[in-house]
Amino acid sequence: MAQRDAVPSLPPKFKLKGNNMTDEQNPSAWAVSTPQRFTDIEFADDYTRNDLHEYVLYPQMCGNIILEGGYGCGKSTIAAIIAKERLGTTASVYEINGDAWADDTLIKLRSIFNLARVCKEIPIVIINEVDRLKDKQFKLRDFLDEHNQRLLVIMTTNHLGNIDGSLKDRSDVFRVRGFEPQLAVRVAQRVLQRYGLAVADNDLLQLFERNLIGDETELSLRQIGRAVDKLVLQVGKRQPSNPSKPLLTVV
């Protein structure tokens, strides 16, 4: 049977350590490795990691953050985990996509703010793709002015140039970069090693360099994840090792 074009052929150096499993037994290795804590998140540079980590270390910090970067570089994941580590699953966190902003959104935001004050918590508002607010951005600006330094607002965007200058002036902007092929190798190896797959760094580097399109120099986490899943599916997979249960012998 002919091999599907979507799955790259692997050089002979790729080896499997562990037991082969069928595709049906093989969920996405990348999805299983989704970050659960801030320290699990992959960053392309330590400056951004350290600056954003302060919002976790000091939960009393307020203000407005804009996370800008290319598609699939982890902006929404960063925002969600900052909120989770500061507030857990309380009702003081409100998340919305920019294109879902409705006439009653400000009413909901004020309700969240008032509830958080009763609970003596600093509320967090996450607005994904804030540039898609378009002409409604001034309503968000007025809300930020109304509650200045009394909540944390985390906004994400793929297009910083589409955000009104007054919002950018009121916010700290952090560039969430993609990963150059050398850094992508490090990210991929952490997941592959969990599944007992031995892949040479140079082979991974060549694979990621081939995934760059045109004059691109960086890969998104989604691109790295798809490559990892293809490798796990093709080469084989074993579950992360757990202590085996003792065998009982009846005599």
PLM regions: where:
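Pre-Walker A (pre-P-loop) alpha-helix and adjacent loop at the N terminus of AAA/AAA+ ATPase modules
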Residues: 24-68, 112-115
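Short glycine-rich substrate-engagement loop in P-loop NTPases that contacts/grips substrate
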Residues: 46-50, 91-123
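Conserved AAA+ ATPase "SRH/arginine-finger" region at the nucleotide-binding site
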Residues: 98-99, 172-185
